[in-house]
Amino acid sequence: TCYLIEQYRQDDTAFLGVLSAIRSGHVEEMHYEELARRHTEPAGLPADAPKLFSHNADVDRINATALAKLSGTAKKFKMSSKGKDSLVEGLMRGCLSPEVLELKEGAAVMFTKNSPPASAGRQGRFVNGTLGIVAGWAADGMPIIKTKNGLRITTEPMEWQLEEQGKVRASISQIPLRLAYAMTVHKSQGMSMDAAIMDLSKAFEYGQGYVALSRVRRLSGVYLTGLNQRALE
């Protein structure tokens, strides 16, 4: 298994020790104990932390259920694309924002891309993984997001591009958001989170536990509802 070294994300020595042990394949009893202390019963789980799952079906079910509980009509934002179908499909598979983004006021969301340079448009600063809620809609219908630190950001569509030899071969455009109630471990790669709820009892791929755990900045932000040995391999 190949692991990217992303130690800059964490600021917790004990947590770094656990992650290093998983990465090097030298997980010991003390590392299991460290993680076992983060096992949390349902009543103790934070309401606003995203849930990480191994399987898409769990993610889709939780996001759809949470959105349905909110009052009001959902607004839909459809992805647009340019270029050859096969190239566009590849971009869409790698894009964290869905082809059709459904939002309601009050929905928990996560940014799926880093913000453009400060000079670009009206968007505030955000990174891939910034959490917030839909606070309302701009005059042109674009979602206004209130982030966890109180920043209000009016979102606009952004592009994901496939370039070859300096030329753009295909591109997709979508608002850089997704519902943040749940996501797959795979889709969380590259994100940096303050907290996440994760069930690693069903981890089925080598490295999956490492990817999930290393999304979170510190051990106190990890909420485990299940863990199997495979997750730490």
Task: Enumerate the predicted regions with their spans.
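Conserved helicase motor core of P-loop NTPases
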Residues: 1-127, 135
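C-terminal accessory regions
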Residues: 107-233
